[in-house]
Amino acid sequence: MPDVLVKEERLWTYRDYREWDLKEGERYELIYGVAYAMSAPNAVHQSIVAALTAKFYTFLEGKPCKIYPAPYDVRLFYEEDENDDTVVQPDLTVVCDEKKRGPEGCRGAPDLVVEILSPSNTVIEMERKFDL
């Protein structure tokens, strides 16, 4: 997927992100204030996500950890800060600490994230997310 900036070139915050009027199925990630459009996943990608979600769900049943497939916002900072500049949506997110789970997604580092890679992923895109 080519990187696409949303709206005009500027730095965005979580507050901005929450106020965007997005069309159905439109998704973005904020990484250090830069907004990147996310393309719709293909059928193979979705099949892998579904299979892994089912396996993790079964494994985690009865444990404090919960599995969340995308779209599920992950903010790496725990504090309630509307000025956060990074919000990502990993393909799968596991969160064990109940205090990190909220109606708006995960606040703080999750216990596990899974990204399904595809041939369309660029090296720059993968490095950008890995460095988080």
Language-model features and meaning:
Residues 1-132:
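Gly/Pro/Ser/Thr-rich low-complexity, intrinsically disordered segments predominantly at protein N-termini
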